[in-house]
Amino acid sequence: MFSLQRLLGKEDKFFTLLEASAHQAHTSVQALVKFTKALDQQVHLDEFVHSRRKDKEITQEISEAVYTTFITALEREDIEQLSNALYKIPKTVEKFSERVLLAPQHVRGIDFSTQISLLERATNTLHDMVKSLRDGMDLERVKDLNEKLQYLEGEADKQMMVLYKDLFSGMHEPLQVIVLKDLYELLEKVIDRCRDAGNVISHIVLKNS
């Protein structure tokens, strides 16, 4: 049955879905905190799988709604670009946890807390940026939040240099160097995903200011 309301769409539908996706990104990092604190115990991927699947459902719902809604609060291309950028965050986090479980003997005793703390702050900042789309797209506020995100990415880059220095110090077995390098770079990629999503939001707000 034809529905004019469905065609026009609810004004806040996409904001709600994008905020839910940003929340899943932050939730996946919170699960990562618990995961890395329990590496000496039996750990499971359930939380990561649930978060990534939930975000995939949200992403699919956004994609379908974009093409079935006549009027959208944001441009369709912007909605899809941001949705895809957000989905890559829990997807990459899940990939990290899978790799850890492939070689647990090489990660016991390894401290990922500095990188993960930066990820927590980055996903929290990103969530605030997504919420700003509904709250009037305040350009100055979004600029401030994006600058914070860029700062966190810079701090993550510095931390990578510290980690590389340790890896190549000769204190680790060759196989462990390979494993840890891969894991460190996956965490770095998560914050890069946050940066990418933040840049999309900044572009949207600038275009609509």
PLM feature segments, named:
Residues 1-209:
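Cytosolic, long alpha-helical scaffolding segments
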